[in-house]
Amino acid sequence: MLPIGIENATKIMNYISKGGKEYVCVMQVHCEYNKEELAKIISSFKGEIYQRPPVRSSVKRRLRIRRIYDIEILDMDKKLVLLRVNCDSGTYMRKLCHDIGIIYGCGAHMRELRRTRSGIFTESTNLVKLHELSEAIYLYKNCKDETELRRVLIPMEFATCEIPKIVIEDSAVNALAYGAQLAVPGVVAYQNFKKNDTVAVLTLKGELVATGNALMDSEELENAKKGIVVNLSRVFMQRDIYPKAWKKHES
């Protein structure tokens, strides 16, 4: 399961990549094992663990903390163990299998790996095969039928489902598209959030305008009359889609 962004949606992929992951992997144990003893060791990895990335990895090999939210044994067959793991982003399954083998005493390694969830995107509901995408593009280009294309392409707003949202006035949209900061008077509605939380800024129609870090709590915003609400980090709305609502100062 690999979410892919195209055009403007590539800007939001950083938020998706930081979401939790679910993997199904095959671990091979290097000796005959007692099922109950191995199951007990595997379950002990649930919670916070220390991991140092493998030698062959794309990041620096620094010791770091990752959380295993759930680890489940799906099947055991001879020396093979089928696992389902829900974990933080950046958790290495091959290192997890290696560490389980060390604790058991005879070693283990990962044989196969499949990612079944990335953030809010799951294999059961969002997975699209390449041939399906190819067929959808063919139907759109040659038959002017966009039904399949709309099925396989998901609006980028979907990626903000787990991010607190702030809805703004239409009059503030173009100002933000030009780089202005979001001030209190431009806010129409909002969900609960804390200072420094990542928030998504939407139009009244639900279109994604920008994302950024909150400069105040939602409780503080409730009574505020002025001030900057969000420090914008990514702007998605194209300029001049919404009309300008500010005037230039006369010289």
UniProtKB/Swiss-Prot annotation:
Organism superkingdom: Archaea
EC number: 5.4.99.25
Keywords: Isomerase, tRNA processing
Membrane-spanning parts: none
Residue ranges of every copy of the PUA domain listed in the record: 163-237
Catalytically driven reaction(s): uridine(55) in tRNA = pseudouridine(55) in tRNA
GO terms assigned for molecular function: pseudouridine synthase activity; RNA binding; tRNA pseudouridine(55) synthase activity
One of the GO biological process terms: tRNA processing
Function: Could be responsible for synthesis of pseudouridine from uracil-55 in the psi GC loop of transfer RNAs.
Matching PANTHER family: CENTROMERE/MICROTUBULE BINDING PROTEIN CBF5, H_ACA RIBONUCLEOPROTEIN COMPLEX SUBUNIT DKC1
Family: Belongs to the pseudouridine synthase TruB family. Type 2 subfamily.
Protein name: Probable tRNA pseudouridine synthase B
Organism in which the protein naturally occurs: Saccharolobus solfataricus (strain ATCC 35092 / DSM 1617 / JCM 11322 / P2) (Sulfolobus solfataricus)
